[in-house]
Amino acid sequence: EKLIVIDEEIIFERLLYHYSIKENVEFICPFMNVRKVICKIKVIILFYFKMIRSFVGLIYKIFLCRYYFKEKLKNQSTQKKYVIIKSFAYERSFVNKNQYVDPFFGNLSAYLIQNKHNVMSVVSCLGNYKKIIKKLFNIENIVYPCELFISPLKLIITFIKVITLRLKVKENIYFNKINLSQFINEYLSLNKVNELSLKHILYFNSMNTMLKIFKSEIFISTYENMPWEPMCYLGIKDASPETKIIGCQHTVVSEFSTNYFLYDNELKNRQLPDKICTVGPVTKRIIERNCGYNHPPIESACALRYQHLKQEDVRFRRNKRKILVALEGIDDVYKLVNYVCNELSQNDNIEIIIRPHPILPLSKIDKNI
């Protein structure tokens, strides 16, 4: 027997309903249809609100980028071949007001420049967008925001396509010999608001436009197999098939990090980097052990984010045990903090270290702790 755990009541009800019809079993569930209608209306309202808000926000970002970077972009040489690094920028990613410090790739840019490469960075801004754009404008490094390369016309066309798109699986999808097609379609119909991102889709246009302007021999990006990544890679390969894409896995990979574990169907239909570099050999083994056979080459590499640890002295273990609680950048993480503190606060032999996510500092969740 197989067990599928479903944490949404309305989806569970709908699956039982469809199963009952198939097996000619009477199914009685008071107010199921009413709940479904209410849920559908809620989903539609939230979806349109999210898309319109995203559309307006992107329009603002596109024109803000063009206001600051239009002349700078015109003066950038298009004859050189660049190593392009796709990274991120926070408000704290700057020193001396005129230098950008890459929070994910450290000194990689400086190393490549020393080795006679032309380097350009393109970043997603996380935090106060206008403040970050102003700081990017004043720095010495060649760094551009992703939104600079998005066409307003493409934004409008993509927006119309997304709001009229109906997500539906047409083929039978099996997991452990169980047909999950109906489940997936029910999920998609009620979670469209969470599954579609206008910004993620537009990474195709952004990277495609950039690679039509600038020549690139190598494109380097973070690699977590997030939704924006295949759109980014598709845009690059469409504009410049010869560009080699290197995905740098930059953090811990556990046995339940399923976003890293791709099987044959996904590998066949998903654009991936030409090579994936991991943080050390252990991470490499975990990904290889849980992936299909046609996965791109995986190489063990260094931890660029943690270069500062080379300066640290080795610390010997103490009797007091430490537990590191690394938080995600989502609002509900306070529940994890509360759980850990409640369970372990009375144990004097354990020290709890809480590491907040860069986009969600403790100051934003401490009211719930």
Task: Show which residues each predicted segment covers.
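Catalytic-core helical/loop segments in enzymes performing group transfer/polymerization on anionic/lipid-linked
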Residues: 1-369
